[in-house]
Amino acid sequence: MSKEKFERTKPHVNVGTIGHVDHGKTTLTAAITTVLAKTYGGSARAFDQIDNAPEEKARGITINTSHVEYDTPSRHYAHVDCPGHADYVKNMITGAAQMDGAILVVAATDGPMPQTREHILLGRQVGVPFIIVFLNKCDMVDDEELLELVEMEVRELLSQYDFPGDDTPIIRGSALKALEGEAEWEAKIVELAGYLDSYIPEPERAIDKPFLLPIEDVFSISGRGTVVTGRVERGIVKVGEEVEIVGIKETAKSTCTGVEMFRKLLDEGRAGENVGVLLRGIKREEIERGQVLAKPGSIKPHTKFESEVYILSKDEGGRHTPFFKGYRPQFYFRTTDVTGTIELPEGVEMVMPGDNIQMVVTLIHPIAMDDGLRFAIREGGRTVGAGVVAKVIS
């Protein structure tokens, strides 16, 4: 067995298992780590190590999630698995575990079930870009026609939610038999890993995306001008480049005349760094926290969007009572709260703590946003929900 060493040279990809309860997500997770460790080196994780998922807090929400890692010859994977359905809902909406692709586990003995559909819908809403299907428990189905029927149903379901159902890879396997070391079923796990490598494209790194910095603070420095500070979310800003100030007010243009970090002057600020950016020709009062600095044309301000939202339960410190249409909380984007109104789906009269729900939100000020942006719902500074922009409307 080769010594473990963390290779930074390999692309890093985030994946996870989704699907109906008891269809074998956790068993598959254990089988992947075990078979790939045996095939390519690395460490296996036992089923019970994965099933005892530790509690985590993401935006004040309690989520049980297991994280495992494994390697193929060309990539390093970080993989999340959740014990309960509610954990998946919270995980996907908060983006606590951002997935570059998901493995949808469907038991061949059952076919698609209610949570199968719900997880596909959630995947669509929160922007999981690719889904691969693992048809599990195939050792228990002798009838080839039945397997073909289940495959067809899964493809139709994926297509319903705008995933390419006809082109989605479907691997027929048995996670349990693979875990028990039966060669023909171990081969199916290696086949699945091959599809992870080939079907999920390498994710674009934050530093390669267009520049964006959420503004946290604004200062004026006499004789030099106005400085905004914040952590660069993505991309690079170079001294001398044009930037746009987006959100809350009319979009304005400026030029970056300096970048500093820890009181040192730099030529550029990069994704992940906390920097101050000096702006030419902008007055202190023309710019505020909650706006973003961005590469011109890369992001637009919007006020109305479709969202997928999780409302905290009472135990999580959320509301104790339901809310109704006409509810006007604050929506916290990046660095600031903006009041907004909501429209509930047809036939939904009220939303209870612990529910997840689709809602259309209209903000009183525009905010720089793209599909996939996460936000919190707050009442007087207290978080009562978490959400994601599923689709910008206007």
Swiss-Prot record:
EC nos: 3.6.5.3
Annotated segments matching region G4: 136-139
Gene3D superfamilies xrefs: P-loop containing nucleotide triphosphate hydrolases (3.40.50.300), Translation factors (2.40.30.10)
Pfam families from the UniProt entry: GTP_EFTU, GTP_EFTU_D2, GTP_EFTU_D3
Region named G2: 60-64
Compartments in which it is found: Cytoplasm
Disulfide bond residue pairs: none
Segments for region (G5): 174-176
UniProt superkingdom: Bacteria
Main subcellular location of this protein, as a coarse class: cytoplasm
Reactions catalysed, as given in the entry: GTP + H2O = GDP + phosphate + H(+)
PROSITE patterns the record matches: G_TR_1, G_TR_2
Residues annotated for GTP binding in this entry: 19-26, 81-85, 136-139
Region ranges (G3): 81-84
GO cellular component term, pick one: cytosol
All copies of domain tr-type G, residue ranges: 10-204
Keywords, alphabetical: Cytoplasm, Elongation factor, GTP-binding, Hydrolase, Magnesium, Metal-binding, Nucleotide-binding, Protein biosynthesis
Listed NCBIfam families: EF-Tu (TIGR00485), PRK00049.1 (NF000766), PRK12735.1 (NF009372), PRK12736.1 (NF009373), small_GTP (TIGR00231)
Cited function: GTP hydrolase that promotes the GTP-dependent binding of aminoacyl-tRNA to the A-site of ribosomes during protein biosynthesis.
Subunit organization: Monomer.
Identification of the protein by name: Elongation factor Tu
Highest classification ranks of the organism: Bacteria, Pseudomonadati, Pseudomonadota, Gammaproteobacteria, Enterobacterales
Gene for this chain: tuf1
